[in-house]
Amino acid sequence: MTRDEFDAYCKSLTATTNVVQWGGSSVWKVGGKIFTICSHWGPVDRDCISFKCTDHSYQVLCELPGVVPAPYLARAKWVQVQSNETLTDDDIKSYIEEAHAIIAAKLTKKQQRDLGLLPA
């Protein structure tokens, strides 16, 4: 998945915002909280996608070649996809959507309603 495809997909999710920070990283948020990042963090010389995941997904994904605990964020169960061969674009989109849902669920009910994540 290219950075442009990553950004386009993240933009399509409900109530997302984007900021470019930390040396040019594309940081996507819901309710002001980060759920995914496309960056050059780590040893690979290309954009890598990092995202929040469930405990189970974290364990499974970290066993795959080309997926590592995300630099600076691993303790919060984030992974970084460093290889285009490990996961399909659809797989990555599914994990990004799950990351969005995980972070959105941590917002207050009022925030969720205000952002259109829950019925009014």
Predicted regions and their residues:
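Charge-dense, helix-prone N-terminal extensions
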Residues: M1-A120
